[in-house]
Each structure stands twice: as structure tokens, then as C-alpha cells.
Amino acid sequence: MSTSRNIQHIHGYYSPDDLFGKIIEGLDKLGKDLANVTLDDLQPVDEFHIRGDTATRELIRLAEFTPDMHILDVGCGIGGSTRRLSRETGCRATGVDLSDVYIDTANRLTQLLDMQERVAFHACSALELPFEDNFFDGVWSLQMNMNVEDKLSWLRETCRVLKPGGRAVFYEVCGNRNSPLYFPVPWAQDGSMSYLLSPELFREAMRAAGFVIEVWNDKTDLAQKAFANAK
């Protein structure tokens, strides 16, 4: 599949109808006060990466971002981890995602929480970020590589917008040559939009893109426990 067709395919997969309305309807059914919605009220739907807000908080501690920083969230979805990152560190945060439906929902949820002064979102491809070189103090990306076929271009583009000496935090799913992948999975209905690398190849791609790896934590066991507990 060509890059443009692949992007269109992924965009369609992540563009559900009236997502914001469905979230509001769900909150109402749970008896939430829609005039006083909190980050934790939204957590079940807006932090749907593996281990949810528990993982987000671990990554926030690892990142050590500070209030004077401007952080880019690449593949932000509807912005849950972007908002939590900003709320808990005080940093400015900008999220980008390919899905304009996700971005519209992210902006509306951010306004609902009155966080729009510190958090903003833009629809774009991670392969062509609309920012100047050395623009962000830090980069944050949670489980988006699985849909990216050209990982080197994505990582190079992410590195390009990061200031020299800036820190990037990636929380990603990698493949295992000895374990076949059975579809559907959370990020793909079939193999046409799933592109997993082994941990070894992912590290090679990161280094080739210009990153220096300081910390590498394998959370496979915790992820497996999270899936087992969800059954």
C-alpha cells in the first residue's frame, strides 16, 4: 500500500462519527456533572493506551518536564495524556494527530476542562509536522508507532522539531518474532495497517533518527497483566 493510501486508511479507522457527543452521552449516563467534568472523569475514554493513567503518571515522572517547557505530543488521540501531562507538570502542551475527528474532540474536551490556555491540538501527519526546527523543549508519544510504516521518517521528523538537548519520551508497542499477532488488535483490524518492529530494530531506528537512548524500560509483563485483568 502506498504511503498516501495508508494514511487515508488509518485516518478512516480513527474517525468515528460524533465522538464528542458519544463521550458526553456516556458521562451523562454515569451521572457526571457536565459543568464540572474532571480529568479522572474522562480517563476511561481518553487515556486508552495500555495501563491508562497509571502508565501516564509513570512516564510523567520519568520525563521530568517542567512548567517553563513546551512539549509536543505526537499521536495524541483525543488528548487525555496531553492534558494530564500539562495539568501535573504545568507545561504547555501541543498535541498532533492524523485524525481530524480526534483533534476536534480533543479541543472540545480541553475547553470543557477549561485547559485551552495551556493545551492545544492540531490535525497533521507525524511525517510532516508543521513546526520549525528545534521548536519544542520536549517530545511525548504514547503508542502510535504501530500504525507508522515509515518509522525512520517519523522519528527523524520528531527529532527535527526537538531542541538540542531536549528529552523525548516514547511509550510504544514492539513486535516479537516468536509470537504471531492475531487480529483484530486495538490499533488495527488486520495486517494492512499494523507495522511492528522488534525492540532491537526499534532502537536501531531511534538511533538512526538522531536520538540517544538514555533509558529503556521493558513493561511487557505489566502490559500482559493489564490485559489479563481486563478480561
Q: Where are each of the predicted segments found?
A:
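A short glycine-rich, Lys/Arg-flanked "PGG" loop and its adjoining helix->strand segment in the class I
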Residues: 152-167
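N-terminal auxiliary segments of SAM/dcSAM-dependent transferases
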Residues: 1-29
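Conserved alpha-helix/loop element of class I SAM-dependent methyltransferases that forms part
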Residues: 32-33, 49-69
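Substrate-binding/catalytic lobe of Class I Rossmann-like enzymes that use SAM or dcSAM, i.e.
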Residues: 191-231
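Short, glycine-/aromatic-enriched active-site segment of Class I SAM-dependent methyltransferases
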Residues: 173-193
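A short SAM/SAH-binding and catalytic strip from SAM-dependent methyltransferases
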Residues: 137-150
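A short acidic, Gly/Pro-enriched loop at the edge of an enzyme's catalytic core
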Residues: 127-138
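Class I SAM-dependent methyltransferase SAM/SAH-binding core
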Residues: 70-128
